[in-house]
Amino acid sequence: MTTKEFAKILQDKLTSEYGVDLSVASKQQIYRSLALICRQMMSENHKKFQSKAIGTGTKQVYYLCMEFLMGRSLKVSLFNLGLEDVAQKVLADADINIEGIFEEEPDAGLGNGGLGRLAACYLDGMATTGICGTGYSILYEYGIFKQKIVDGWQQERADNWLPGGQVWLKSHPDQAIEVRFDGEIRENWDHGFHYIQHTNYNSVMAVPSDMYVQGYDGKGVAKLRLWQAKAPDFDMSSFSLGNYNTAMSKNASAELISKVLYPNDNHIEGKILRLRQQYFLSAASIGDIVQNHLSTYGTLENLADKVAIQLNDTHPTLAIPEMMRILLDECGFDWDKAFEICQKVFAYTNHTVMAEALEKWNVDIFKMTLPRIYQIVVEMNRRAREELEKAFPGDEGKINYMALIGDNQVRMANICAYTANSINGVSKLHSEIIKESVFHDYYLFKPQAFKNVTNGIAYRRWLLASNPELCKLLDETIGEEYKHDASNLSKLNKYADDKTVLKRINEIKLNNKKNFAAYLEKSTGQVIDPNSIFDCQVKRMHEYKRQHLNALNIAAQYLYLKENPNADFIPKTYIFGAKAAPGYYMAKQMIRMICKLGDLINNDPAVRDKLRVVYLEEYCVSLSEHLMPAAEVSEQISLAGTEASGTGNMKFMLNGAITLGTLDGANVEIADAAGKENELIFGMLTPEVNNLKQVGYHPSAFIMGDDVANAALNFLERGWNGEDFHEVTENLRTSDPYMVMADFKDYRRAQADLQRLYADREKWAQMSLKNTANSGIFS
């Protein structure tokens, strides 16, 4: 498209929507107009793409996930449509900076962490490779929450993203689906047919809104269908009788389902709301999938041949019994045929190696909230136990562990494991661990179902759209084929000894650091030194991710620099970004400790030129796009055997950051790909962790005799300015569930190696090059 053509399209949209000329339009008006242009183009492309797929009988892939961490859409949509350069030129001609327009868009409040980002990347990947993919989730009105740090404490505020983000959504109230909760079930048999009557239920309407993800170079378009909860109709009779609260409460109760992502479940009301959310997503999505299939083929007999449904984690597990309900109650299939269809259609991705994190629901809550689904799960469980008895005769312990219901709980992961045709982990290590521990019995029962699908990233977003200077170097050295196939990045390996290229890599990284420092100062007022090492740990705040290990080392470095002010120490900026779950007290204490430690260090003139700590409030995808090109060290320091995979580690690697990490999750594959000599590996291996657990782990054994560990713990315990962090340190001294103290000494060794290697600028650039060159396997 020419500049002139695009300028006319933009002006026409500004005129029709706002009645203004480009020269006087506000940034918000320009953003919305560009978004509408992209949405219209992608909608038309999607219609053509789907029409062709239906005509050839192509299989449809449906991806159900509780969250999709989409970030901003304008920049990536223009980029994938091939319109970013022309849009930039049109705006520049009007003396408008396109980056300022991008900043008008809020991050979509549809996700939280790696689970949601993986889901978003899969949509991008399906669209780019021409797979007919549709994602399903909930249209959260307020997202998870907007993070505000006040005096070191995380505060949660409503993330009112829809006013700015709704422009990407097209609502389809005519395609709404009824979802039923509560009530009683009556069963009747008539001439051999089984009839179900659901009475006294509460209805909620699932109203769909669609947004689109354009594949790179226009190969395909994926759709993300988001469900908004609405009351079926206003209770006029109650209102007319003066029962205003009753009339309004029905609306409020229904719409609560799509208010926020992951409501606090530290109380019974929160648990019920989460269960309702999960069934709402599952029932609406399965109803939509069945309707789509029937409208195309007129029968469900071929559903398994034409449909694949991927369950991303256990949140959408109820899609399985809901599909059974539709096939049994509405379509007249017998049990065996219905379950055979489910087995062929559903696949399951597991995201945790910790058995305690696998979702389970109290039977009483489940039965009350979803009476018909409970009946189906009970029958599934009965049949499963019969089948398992044949496979493991007399092994009651194994059968009880594998059962779908047990200990007064409905076990989501076991429903998936029993039904799904494919059960995958998200890294090689994780996939082995689930076969050996969490799902070992199911692996013995159906070994052919278990496989590994290592996580990946939408690399064009994190490289092409985020790091143009590095892309320019890649274009000049290896050509542009990598833009279409990431495996071509490996061609960069032949420049590992090219001093000119290595010098350019260091220059590009420094320039990206300057850009990030300027962005940070402008947006937050925080000042950092671009010549310092940028050491980054940005991920969900959780004990198993061990941000407190990082903080403990920072405290140790602070004490060292106070005692040795003239020490040879390359200046370092530690960058954190993370949200803690609202009800997770220890994670919030960790945030407070990091923020207060940062305040102390950043305001101490004796050390602040050598050591700084930055906490990125409200860390999100768009902020990540600024940070990734500037990062030099990627902290991936979870206890070996606890992190399933990770995707942030891959984005850092792609942009040339060196992984400082344990051999956990996808770190193993990163080290294998780039070479362990090009990463900073520390800590126990998974078998060592397991052995230590078996013999009994006592953190005191690792603290005793370690003067540095003792000094750092004592320092944090005593605190400063009337604040202390004894709850964190007491946890580390006594229980330390994620073995921070066991790995602390080796972590310090890795940090010392980092300082030594970074001093050799050519060697560091070579390590950086090796990471970028070998990151293509994660695309």
Give residue ranges: language-model regions.
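A conserved ligand/cofactor-binding region detector
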Residues: 1-779
